[in-house]
From Swiss-Prot:
The lineage of its organism: Eukaryota, Metazoa, Spiralia, Lophotrochozoa, Mollusca. The gene is ND1. PANTHER family: NADH DEHYDROGENASE SUBUNIT 1, NADH-UBIQUINONE OXIDOREDUCTASE CHAIN 1. This is NADH-ubiquinone oxidoreductase chain 1. Belongs to the complex I subunit 1 family. One of its GO terms (cellular component) is mitochondrial inner membrane. It is an enzyme of class 7 (translocase). It comes from Heterololigo bleekeri. Core subunit of the mitochondrial membrane respiratory chain NADH dehydrogenase (Complex I) that is believed to belong to the minimal assembly required for catalysis. Complex I functions in the transfer of electrons from NADH to the respiratory chain. The immediate electron acceptor for the enzyme is believed to be ubiquinone.
């Protein structure tokens, strides 16, 4: 049984990495068409092998270690970031979800909150002012929006009465939580965009102020691992949006095609938002969470608590 669980987890991680590779191609092609150009189309048929060519290029580059970095933690942080991103995908390993019982969402909260340490370490151990300031911005942004994400998640758990992801999905077989909690769903999506440091909330970097942010000193393998972790988190958040608000179990169907279509649409929304909206201001981003989202989420959560208490007698 343990071997089956282990193999199932490994397969989940490998599939996630393959999805990340082709999601980067989708983003580059999509942004190209948004900007009235073709995007990558020279490698193979319509540019489809482009992610494989990029992987070969990045992983065969020389490992450059800047003079002032703390070498060991500098090299460990990207690997730690990717490891944490892949651990989240174990939630969608059927055997592991069953063995976790009612604690799968608790695992999500714990692992997702650990991601800020790898980002902070990547900037801190680079011993670069640009990288350090970028990591401080990224950590402040992540911690702020984790507050709203946790409270929104609590509202979903309150409606279902369980911390099990499989129970949340089964609960929505007849009615989606998105219909009951539509504004929470919108706030969750915006929080996911901010949590993954995506445009228009990409304040961890900035060409005119922070260069590339916390990954300024990374090249080759380190750069690849950091961005694989970022895109892995984007895809995981897309799956989680469908599971929490649109009853992911309903779409499983034949070979899970319905679920794949819905997740692809949410992933495309991340790209669409990046292509459509200008960069936000950092102070307005913080005002959005602390002065708008937090009071709204707390009010809705209190309303749900009172409603559930009254309905349960």
């Amino acid at each position: 049984m343990m071997l089956v669980e282990l193999l199932s987890g490994v397969i989940s991680c490998v599939c996630a990495l393959l999805a990340v590779a082709f999601f980067t191609l989708l983003e580059r092609k999509g942004l190209g068409y948004f900007q009235l150009r073709k995007g990558p189309n020279k490698v193979g048929l319509m540019g489809l092998p482009q992610p494989l060519a990029d992987a070969v290029k990045l992983f065969t580059e020389e490992l450059v270690k800047p003079t002032l970095v703390n070498v060991f933690p500098f090299l460990v942080c990207p690997a730690m970031s990717l490891f944490l991103a892949l651990v989240l995908w174990i939630l969608y390993n059927n055997y592991f979800v069953c063995s976790m019982g009612g604690l799968s969402m608790l695992l999500f909260l714990c692992v997702s909150s650990l991601g800020v340490y790898s980002v902070m370490g990547a900037g801190w151990f680079s011993n670069s002012k640009y990288a350090l300031l970028g990591s401080v911005r990224a950590v402040a942004q992540s911690i702020s929006y984790e507050v709203s994400m946790s409270l929104i998640l609590m509202s979903c758990l309150l409606l279902v009465g369980s911390m099990s992801l499989s129970m949340i999905m089964k609960y929505q077989f007849f009615v989606w939580v998105a219909f009951v909690n539509f504004f929470m769903m919108l706030m969750w999506f915006v929080s996911c965009v901010a949590e993954t440091h995506r445009a228009p909330f990409d304040f961890a970097e900035g060409e005119s102020e922070l260069v590339s942010g916390f990954n300024t000193e990374y090249g080759g393998v380190g750069f690849a691992l950091l961005f694989m972790a970022e895109y892995g988190n984007i895809l995981f958040m897309s799956v989680l949006v469908i599971s929490l608000f649109f009853g992911g179990v309903v779409f499983v169907g034949v070979f899970g095609m319905g679920l794949c279509v819905m997740v692809s649409f949410v992933g495309w929304l991340f790209i669409w938002v990046r292509a459509s909206y200008p960069r936000y201001r950092y102070d307005l981003l913080m005002y959005l969470i602390w002065k708008s989202y937090l009071p709204s989420v707390l009010s809705i959560l209190m309303f749900l608590v009172v409603s559930v208490y009254i309905l349960n007698g």
